[in-house]
Structures are given as structure tokens and as C-alpha cells.
Amino acid sequence: MLKEFKEQRLNEIQELRSMGIEPYPYKFEKELTAREIREKYDYLQAGEVLESEKLSFAGRVMSIRHHGKTAFFHMKDDTGRIQAYVRADSVGKEKMDLFKRHVKIGDFIGVRGFPFKSKTGELTIYVQEYTLLSKALRPLPEKWHGIKDKEIIYRQRYLELIVSDEAIERFRKRFKAVQVIREFLNSRGFIEVETPILHYVTGGAEARPFVTHLNVFDIDMYLRIAPELYLKRLIIGGFEKIYEIGKNFRNEGISYKHSPEFTSIEIYQAYADYNDMMDLTEELIVEVVKRTCGTLKISYQGKEIDFTPPWKRVRMRDFLKEKLGVDILEDPDEVLLKKLEEYGVELEIKNRAHLIDKLRDLVEEELVNPTFIIDHPVVISPLAKRHREDPRLTERFELIIFGREIANAFSELNDPVDQYQRFLEQAKMREEGDEEAHMMDLDFVRALEYGMPPTGGLGIGLDRLFMFITDSPTIRDVIPFPIVKPQKFEEEEAEFEGGFEE
């Protein structure tokens, strides 16, 4: 079917060019969007014509209904859809015949005319001129059933965006949220900065990195798992309020909440601590939810999440003691391991840090509304400052929403001797087989030796946050082009043939 369809369209293109018509012209003067047309002329009554108002519009043809010497068709741009009406006694018989023969669903056209409302009350453009702007060689998914196979959606996101207004709105929300974040931070005196994607040493998170090779120096390098250590170098250098929005890469599994490539924001503020960063996190996310959703109580997968501040703050030690009956500071490893075994949790690595991490995972699922889990043990927080009241703990928090970690923040460790010792402990864990433990970063220790002011640091996983504001069940639904298992092109074409409802 696809082969025959493309051949037919290619023949049409050849026919157009033989008539002196270029099916892929260079530009068109589009004056209004679909939304602007609706907003400007929605006051018209059914059957009312406003011939004195001239407008131009361009978009993709999504449907056509031919009626003899006339046709109604719907066009779509990135703000929505608008109906248009063309007839022979307006554009001329030759152009009408050309429209019937060569303007097809999926093509882009530009129109000029005036607004009116049909007898049924639908705002419509009365076409006086039209220009073919781009011929589509492939058929669109059938309107009502759309795309059946989610893998097609993820591999060919452009298809979903073409046929689904909901998909356009989902990603518009995502992109608007990023804009809101920038406006929020810029208005508070933060500067957006850039740090390297290629790292000599991984750091800033516990994760398995992607390894690449730099030919010019004949050395292995790593795609960053987090920008943290470079951002703190900027704080050491003299910047005081900075943030970076960008991609991180972790060579780990894919799930509904994990992607090997993901977007995060990290924020650092000199002379602040983790209490200040908690306040900032709450204010920032409240602003994002309010401006993208219009309310602080949103529905996510059938459950309500209430973002109304103030958010609950719970000490990790107290939380795990209440829920599981274990004391992560006092109980020996054997007690923690036994509790995990009671829940059927299997561990490849059984050091204390992993035991505590897995215990935390058991109970975070029940936290639906935003909750700060605070004051983590030193053993699982190698970059956080020791707690001012209990040196076994750190001044760290994680923000949990709907059972998922959304943010992680510290009073940043700025004691170079303490940091060096913790890197040594992490290096020992790597030697024992923990590939996610931090590498030794002697240059970062050297930078700390020049002095870093008291600093609050914060990282937010933006994709997970965007899942909530778009009510998306999986992280791949909010990443425009997510990583999927590759297929041969021929297999994808076969999948295309069978992937649509007819």
C-alpha cells in the first residue's frame, strides 16, 4: 500500500512541475495563527460573513470534504485547527480543478481570504487564493483510531504530533514549563551557565556512565552523569547564583520513570543551605504547576496530587523507623538486610549504602503529595555537608512526589579534607564492585582547597516533573524523541504498514 501511495504522489509532483507549479516553494506570508483567527472572529454569528476583513493562514490539510465545485477542509498549525472553504467561482475553475486533483490530506497549503461562520456556526476561512506549500508523500494515520503501536510513536514522534492535538499540547506544556523555570530563576538574580558534557572523571551522582574515546588525545572520556562538580567549580571561581538546564546520561535501565538520556536542572546559591534550597524548590515547582496547569491540585493517573504549600518535611531516620521498624543509624547491616529479605528484595551489592537505599525505596511509594525526606546518612551522601547537629547525618533532602524522587539537594560539602576522605571511601566501594560509586576527582578536591563559600545545591529531574503536569504515565511520553531499541528501516516500514487502524 505504502509503495503504491508514494508512487502516486510522486507522479502528482511530476505533473505539477510539468505545469510550471513548484510543489515545494520557498515561503508564504502567514499573518495569523489558528488560535488568533478564532480569538479575533469568534464573535461572528452563524451564517455571518466578514468580507471586508482579509487574512492569510497556512497549515497542514487534515481533512477534505468535496461537494461538486466546492470543498470544505480543515487545516492545522501548532495552535490548533481551522476550517476553510473553497469554491470554483471564487478561485476560478482551473484552480478549483487543481485543488481537487492535487491538494491532499497531509499537504501544506497557504490560503488568503476572509472569515465567516458556516450555517452550523463553525468559524471558516473563505478562500480567495491558495498556494500549495509542500506535498506529503506518505499517508497519515487514520483520523479516529490513530496510531496503535506505541513503538511507532516513540520512533516517529513527528507522526503523533501531526495527528494528535493532545500530543502538541503535551509538549507545549513541557516547553512552557522550561520557560517558566528560566523566568522564575532569572527574576531572582540567577544566571544560566553552561558546563561540559564530556567529562574526564564522572561525578555528581551515583550512576554507570557512558564511555567514549577522544581520538585527538587518545583518552577515554565520559558523558556527564551530572553537572554538579563543574557548577561548584564556578561557585569556587566567584559566581554566586547559577543554574544549568541540560541533558545528563546514565548507562542504565529504561523504565516508566528512567531514561538513559534525561533533562535536569541544577541550581547553586552561595551563602545558602539546604533549608533555603527546600524553600526555593517548593516555590519553583509551585510556580511551574500553577502556570502550566492553572491549579495546584492536579489529577495524575486517576489520583489527586496537591501541590499547595507548605509541603511536609520528614527526617529519613524517623520515616524508616516508623514504616519499617529499623534504625538506619544504630542497627547493624544484618538487621537492615533481614528487613529487605522480608520484602523479597535481592541485592547484588550489600554494602550499607545500598541497604539504606533499598529500604528507602520500599516506603517512598506511599508518598503521593510533595514530601521532603531530609537528613540522610553520610554513607549515602558523599557530596553533602555533615549535619550541624549530628555528624552521622548530612544536610540533604530529596523531594518525593507520587513515590518518585523529583529533586535532590544539599548544604554542599565545602571542606576539602572531608571531601577527599569521602572520595577515598567511594573509591573503595568501586574496587569492591560498585560501578555506581563516585570516582576520585582530585581536581575538584584541589578546587575546594582554594575555598568554596557555604553553598546550597539543588538538582531536579525535569522529565519526571513534566510527567505530572501532563498526566503522562511514562517518561517516554514527555521526551520528544526517547531512546528506543533500534530497528532496521525495512522493519519499521513493515511496522508502519500494520500499525494503523484503517
Curated annotation (Swiss-Prot):
Reactions catalysed according to its record: tRNA(Lys) + L-lysine + ATP = L-lysyl-tRNA(Lys) + AMP + diphosphate
Details of cofactor binding: Binds 3 Mg(2+) ions per subunit.
Main location: cytoplasm
Family: Belongs to the class-II aminoacyl-tRNA synthetase family.
Binding residues for Mg(2+) 2: E405
Keywords, sorted A to Z: Aminoacyl-tRNA synthetase, ATP-binding, Cytoplasm, Ligase, Magnesium, Metal-binding, Nucleotide-binding, Protein biosynthesis
Protein's UniProt name: Lysine--tRNA ligase
Gene that specifies this protein: lysS
A Pfam family annotated for this UniProt entry: tRNA-synt_2
GO CC annotations, alphabetized: cytosol
GO BP, sorted A to Z: lysyl-tRNA aminoacylation
